[in-house]
Each structure stands twice: as structure tokens, then as C-alpha cells.
Amino acid sequence: MPVRLYLIWGATTTGKTAQSVALARSAGAPVISLDRVQCCHELAVGSGRPSPSELLGTRREYLCEREVSRGVVSAAEANQLLLDKVARYATQERALILEGGSVSLINAMIRDARWSERGEWILRRIPVPGRAAFMAAARKRVREMLDPPPGQAGILDELQGLWGYPRNHAVLEDIDGYRQIIRYANALQVPICRITSIDPNAKALLIERIAQEYWEHALWQEQEFLGIPASWMRADDA
């Protein structure tokens, strides 16, 4: 019997993780994250890796574990890693949940004919809401990233800790969220080694800039998405 593949995808802040966790609990299936940046464990906050408490005991796996200095895994490599993981899991699981928002990876899957033979698909695309609703959710997420609970690291801590290694600079400058913080610091001549000390007004400005960046990225993802091919067998058609 072919493995059942649930594909949950959509833009950042649209609730993919919550949906995948709920489905994992009801189906008893593991989740494989399709987010290429989440492969970098040093970027857990900025990439939106869910915490253990958010996972509610469900199983979640990343495409690989990678240091920031090596750069974000390419879409082509991520596609092959995912193919390998699905092939391995298919021997022991009846269902798998593929969740994420990397349109580059999803488009690489769409272009790869091998996915037509991998299993039965159930597709759940989360649409981008209107700008007001999206920005409200994005602001909430960014605010939590900039002001984490006591004792927990935030995105500023991640950036400050990684910036001491020059080989990380170009990688961080190319990732949503970190990019805006770096631009802000450069414009105001704030050393990154002191970025965790910025005042509430600076954080409020960053919340708006990063939320806007997320919105623009979400629109770009919608434009770039190629569309699921008819050759992917739907579970309802099996």
C-alpha cells in the first residue's frame, strides 16, 4: 500500500505548524519540515522552529542539521534529502506530513517526476490572508522573536552570537528578519555586538520592517508557485 503524503504549505505566519501538529496528533504521523532555513539549528528563533512545548509530543524532523557558516541548503539538495527521507519512512509509516513554506523546494519537487511515484497525496494549501490580517499575525510573531520570555533566546541573541564569525555575515544578510536587523544596525551605526541592547522604539521599528518583509515574501511565494502537477496521485483518486 503506498504511503499517504500530506502536504501542508503556505506563507510564513499562516499557521502551517499548528495545522501540522494537529494532524500529526490525529494521524499519528511524523512531520518533515520543508523549511530550508530551519535546517540551521543556530537560527531556531528567526526561522520559526517550533519549541518542544508547541510540538505537543508529536514527531518532527528537519531535512538536515547544518551550521550557518555552510549556508542555507539549496533547493536541489533539499529535494534529494526529502526524497531519501520519504523513501526511508515509507517502509515503516503509513502516512507522512510534509510541512513548510519554501516555495523553492516545493517547485523543485514539482519539477521532479519521481514525486509522482512516491505515494498518495492529500494537499492542504493555506492561502495568504488579506494584508491587515497577515500583518497582525506577523507583528505578533516578530514581537515574540524580539522580546522572548525571560531565560529564552531571541532573534537578537542569535544574530549577536553568530556575527562574531565573518563567514556567517553573507548568509545572515540573505535571510528574512536578520536582513532587516542588520540593515537597521548599519544605518544607525549600531554595532551588532550591542544589538541586544536596543530600546523599545527601535524594536517597534523593526517589528514593522520585518513584518512588511514577511508580507512581501509571502506575495512573492504566491507568484512563484508553479502549481501541483496532475500526475501526483491524490488519495481520493486511489
Swiss-Prot record:
Catalytic reactions of this protein: dimethylallyl diphosphate + AMP = N(6)-(dimethylallyl)adenosine 5'-phosphate + diphosphate
Swiss-Prot/TrEMBL keywords: Cytokinin biosynthesis, Plasmid, Transferase
A GO molecular function held by the record: AMP dimethylallyltransferase activity
Keyword match Transferase: yes
E.C. no: 2.5.1.27
The keyword Transferase is assigned to this record: yes
Paired cysteines (S-S): none
Pfam families registered for this protein in UniProt: IPT (PF01745)
Alphabetical GO biological process terms: cytokinin biosynthetic process
Domain of life from the UniProt record: Bacteria
SUPFAM superfamilies the record matches: P-loop containing nucleoside triphosphate hydrolases
Annotated family: Belongs to the isopentenyl transferase family.
Role summary: Transfers dimethylallyl groups to AMP as part of the biosynthesis of cytokinin phytohormones.
Protein name: Adenylate dimethylallyltransferase
Organism name: Ralstonia nicotianae (strain ATCC BAA-1114 / GMI1000)
Gene: tzs
